[in-house]
């Protein structure tokens, strides 16, 4: 009986250690986030009101739900991606790809409607895009299934760091994204590389 209890305790201990190790990349309840790499740290702060979600892939550094605005049917989603040094493409290639994920109801070119900006945040070069229309991005890479969401807004940014680019993508109903405009701007301004 003693041997069975000791064996059970060992199994439970191993399971708890494995569970704890498996959550190394999990997001803390705190709004303060950091992603540590061999060449330094990227630090950022998620604004009040955003709901931290468990990242659904290893390329997602952080994932948030931004609660819907009154009148909208669903929440917006914001994901911070990191693919590694020299991975994920150039700033312009990503800006162009994001713009192509929004179609205009009148058939006009989304590129002419998109607002782009280049800025410097805490010494980091940041390229941004903001475009509204019908969201047609693929639901998951390689799935062959695509969104077809009218009156959506996509705000995205490429943050260039010494260890590689980070990619921020916010997509959701236009009213919901507008509700969170200031907190999104604050989020981008919070990025620091230490």
Where are these regions (language model features)?
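C-terminal motif of bacterial Sec signal peptides marking the signal peptidase cleavage site
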Residues: 17-20
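Surface-exposed amphipathic alpha-helical segments
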Residues: 50, 162-194
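Bacterial signal peptide processing site
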Residues: 22-24
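Signature of long, low-cysteine stretches enriched in small and polar/charged residues
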Residues: 95-159
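Bacterial N-terminal signal peptides that target proteins for export
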Residues: 1-10
């Amino acid at each position: 009986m003693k041997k069975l209890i000791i064996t059970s305790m060992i199994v439970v201990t191993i399971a708890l250690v494995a569970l704890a190790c498996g959550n190394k990349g999990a997001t803390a309840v705190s709004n303060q986030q950091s992603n540590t790499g061999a060449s330094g740290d990227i630090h950022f702060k998620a604004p009040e009101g955003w709901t931290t979600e468990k990242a659904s892939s290893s390329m997602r550094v952080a994932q948030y739900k931004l609660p819907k605005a009154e009148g909208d049917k669903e929440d917006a989603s914001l994901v911070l991606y990191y693919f590694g040094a020299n991975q994920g493409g150039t700033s312009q290639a990503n800006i162009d790809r994001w713009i192509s994920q929004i179609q205009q109801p009148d058939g006009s070119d989304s590129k002419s409607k998109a607002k782009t900006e280049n800025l410097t945040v805490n010494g980091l070069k940041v390229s941004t895009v903001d475009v509204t229309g019908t969201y047609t991005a693929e639901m998951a890479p390689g799935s062959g299934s695509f969104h077809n969401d009218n009156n959506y807004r996509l705000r995205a940014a490429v943050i260039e760091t010494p260890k590689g680019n980070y990619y921020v993508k916010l997509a959701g109903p236009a009213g919901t994204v507008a509700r969170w405009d200031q907190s999104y701007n604050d989020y981008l301004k919070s990025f620091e590389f230490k």
